[in-house]
């Protein structure tokens, strides 16, 4: 090959290589732009939905790596999929209840700044559980705690802390309220907060930290709600509210709320005669509530709420071992599943129960006359058979030498089933302990277990003589 041919050959090869490199640089540039704008192609979401992203797979040979050394590839981050809760899993099968949490608020109040509270409850978002209570606008070691036996004042607020964290001075005050309910729909918290004049109160509906809706008193006689968690299924939440006499006929309505906005209000129907302070739980696709009849019955009313067509029915727990306080002795108490038993119906106390096939799990004070002690058990046939009284799996939660109070249910979704848990309010101070001028509480919390368990008693535990007056 003569020199001219060599020059031509080298030039041709060089030109070919340069052309290939140029084309590859164009390809890399196009790839970079594609990665930046189309790394994750998301379809336009439907209303209130976030669709999953599908990554584009880009293949390239090893040679391209050389040219990517100084190239920055930015990836688009897909938003996390957030869905409404539907509670469609079955209820967990349990043998009883195991200890879960205790906040010791009163004992801690002897030497620290802890809120004066009552009407506590527990509710969980998909990842964590929280405790709520209605604060009295004061700490215990404070002269403002004098007279906190009273239920309603403009200073009461709904408090919210992670479960197990007592209500210290840094506690969030969610809203102004002397009656409340809270629940998480899978996306955000809904708080129902009632406050104002007894004859003209207001219920505010706060969703995701914003006031979305409100409703005024419809009977001008202490509008009030559950004092425990509401329930949301597929984005619609339901809460039971009553306005009217505490010892006679009242007007109970069931409200349906979507992202804080009231979408439907239904009147109570069925055979229940008086409804207060319901403890509600999801029973997919519906919601079931066990309430307090403060007028005619020491057997507890049941409300069944259809979340699809908004229909409502009511009755009474069948168990002849009734759940309210005060009540008759077990040997003489009755329930026919449909009507109030007309046995010591007034006043009553907030409580809970839940169905388990034909049986019923329930909790109640040990004393039939006072809010002292606390026990749980299952009644065989207690959900389906009138006046059933066969009791099994009894547990003492608080011995009868110590005070209890309100109690309520909350539900926790596990990997395969929905567990039922409950809390007990441990009231201290007035009216029973007149050495002090305040009324406040701590709580103890138990959850259902399929395992074995032991015995014990979990009272408040504060020595009243150590407490500020």
UniProtKB/Swiss-Prot annotation:
Cofactor(s) listed: Ca(2+)
Keyword Nucleotide-binding: no
Region (Head of neuraminidase): 91-469
Renumbered residue ranges of the record's region Disordered: 325-349
GO MF: exo-alpha-sialidase activity; metal ion binding
Residue positions the entry lists as glycosylated: 61, 69-70, 86, 146, 200, 234, 402
Bilayer topology annotation: Single-pass type II membrane protein
Region listing for Involved in apical transport and lipid raft association, in residue ranges: 11-33
Function of the molecule: Catalyzes the removal of terminal sialic acid residues from viral and cellular glycoconjugates. Cleaves off the terminal sialic acids on the glycosylated HA during virus budding to facilitate virus release. Additionally helps virus spread through the circulation by further removing sialic acids from the cell surface. These cleavages prevent self-aggregation and ensure the efficient spread of the progeny virus from cell to cell. Otherwise, infection would be limited to one round of replication.
Protein name: Neuraminidase
Gene source species: Influenza A virus (strain A/Ann Arbor/6/1960 H2N2)
Record gene name: NA
